[in-house]
């Protein structure tokens, strides 16, 4: 059977309480100058993501949407390599200056780093 690489509703953090659970005490983090990823284990058997790009970091809606689109696309392609964690991605200062290729490289690096740290966390507990 072939694994789906879609990005459906079940792969997203939808409510403020989902986000708050991750923000309250994330055991796993992956950080670069432009992006922070926070992760907390879930019991669902698959990862979920939530994306935050504030107006302070990206003034124009077109920039915020471009950043969110890149994040969702890199997650969609890597979702089967990521353990069952709820993940919040936070855009930081200067992310707007990154073009799509640089942003994609940064995100791919962070997904690898996060997946490795999540697996290490699971093996410890």
UniProtKB/Swiss-Prot annotation:
GO terms for cellular component: ribonuclease P complex. Coiled coil: none annotated. The keyword Nucleotide-binding does not apply. It catalyses: Endonucleolytic cleavage of RNA, removing 5'-extranucleotides from tRNA precursor. This is Ribonuclease P protein component. Belongs to the RnpA family. One of its GO terms (biological process) is tRNA 5'-leader removal. RNaseP catalyzes the removal of the 5'-leader sequence from pre-tRNA to produce the mature 5'-terminus. It can also cleave other RNA substrates such as 4.5S RNA. The protein component plays an auxiliary but essential role in vivo by binding to the 5'-leader sequence and broadening the substrate specificity of the ribozyme. InterPro entries: Ribosomal_Su5_D2-typ_SF, Ribsml_uS5_D2-typ_fold_subgr, RNase_P, RNase_P_CS. It is an enzyme of class 3 (hydrolase). The lineage of its organism: Bacteria, Pseudomonadati, Pseudomonadota, Gammaproteobacteria, Alteromonadales. The keyword Signal does not apply. Keywords: Endonuclease, Hydrolase, Nuclease, RNA-binding, tRNA processing.
